[in-house]
């Protein structure tokens, strides 16, 4: 016990860590049961979260939240945090990919020759469908209509770029 003096944590620091784990557990209670199964939680933690969702009494909710926090202490929070970050869209790689898709859409709408370049980068893309979406998007913008085709173009580009390299890295 005396060898671990350099790793000593104050009681306040420990409480902050425990509250952080309890907050992470509370984020889990907001997810659907199917999503919870995808995370791969311990069976006890999964059952505690599902039970929390069924409870209606405020006192019991508080006790169950503390129990979830207690179970979180025995669980590695890193995979859970990573999964939740990905769900929230905080994943930096995913954000960078979405920015590349947006840049491709802007280029395609601004320059008629950009489609040829895009097709050489992504030969499996459906040129006819992209050409139609680009034309309809330009018409939409001229007539100040809701951006239905603008969004459809983004989704099509995203699908094409994802199928090339998982995250769209060409």
Swiss-Prot record:
GO terms for molecular function: ribosome binding; rRNA binding. InterPro entries: DarP (IPR006839), DarP_sf (IPR023153). The keyword rRNA-binding applies. Keywords: Cytoplasm, Ribosome biogenesis, RNA-binding, rRNA-binding. It comes from the Bacteria. GO terms for biological process: assembly of large subunit precursor of preribosome. Disulfide bonds: none annotated. Pfam families: DarP. It is found in: Cytoplasm. Gene3D superfamilies: PSPTO4464-like domains (1.10.60.30). The keyword Aminoacyl-tRNA synthetase does not apply. GO terms for cellular component: cytoplasm. Belongs to the DarP family. Member of a network of 50S ribosomal subunit biogenesis factors which assembles along the 30S-50S interface, preventing incorrect 23S rRNA structures from forming. Promotes peptidyl transferase center (PTC) maturation. PANTHER family: UPF0307 PROTEIN YJGA. NCBIfam families: PRK05255.1-1 (NF003593). This is Dual-action ribosomal maturation protein DarP. The lineage of its organism: Bacteria, Pseudomonadati, Pseudomonadota, Betaproteobacteria, Neisseriales.
